[in-house]
Amino acid sequence: MLQKSDTNVVAEVLRGQGEFYEFDHYPEGDVYDQETHSQYYYHSHREGEHGHFHTFLREKGMPKDCRPVPQSEADFMKTRDDKLSHLIAISMNRAGYPIHLFTTNRWITADNWYAADDVIRMLDRFEMDLAWPSWPVNIWVTSMLRLFRPQIVELVRKRDAAVANWRKKHPDVDAFEDRGCDITSDRKISVEAQIKRVDQALTTVAT
């Protein structure tokens, strides 16, 4: 749909948003589905990419027994009425194609920290069923979490391992907020290659 219209998901999410400034959230105010309590925004602050989508699930959309792990307190936690968990970030190139998936500590995302097993349980609850700011973009973001679920599960587990390792090596710093540990796991992706793997797996099951 977007290719036929000579556009892409990045252009769509930035459409009508004015100048593109580093660290600002696009669209302004983020995208939030009040029924599923899914949330995302697009911004930029890393070299080697145009920008990236950060995806979240807010507390009301989580399994009822999910609780944050023991962690340092931060001012941003006191300014919200609920909690939220970062799920995965999707890095985009200048042509508007996804090139990486990555996880972070709290320095950029200002979320509450949930254990990997709980974050993995949240993945299937993420769904953006909205027309604003772009229905195709909302479908695309939701579909990316479905298509790359195995890789996201792996990255979330590596995230916990990376933070635990950082805390051992740097006991005097807050690993949840340390800029030296801001990217906790990362991997390159290809939509075309992933679809081929899915097709091959389905063919194997069918035979």
Report the location of each language-model feature:
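N-terminal domain-onset segments
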Residues: 1-32
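Aromatic- and glycine-enriched beta-alpha-beta binding-site module
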Residues: 25-99
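Generic preference for hydrophobic/aromatic residues in regular secondary structure cores
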Residues: 38-42, 98-102, 145, 190-193, ...
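Short linear sequence elements within intrinsically disordered, low-complexity coil regions
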Residues: 45, 58-61, 119, 131, ...
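Alpha-helix initiation/capping motif
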Residues: 56-59, 93, 115-116, 129-133
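Amphipathic alpha-helical interaction segments
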Residues: 58-66, 110, 115, 121-122, ...
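Domain-level detector of nuclease and nuclease-like folds
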Residues: 81, 99-129
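Long, compositionally biased interface segments
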Residues: 133-207
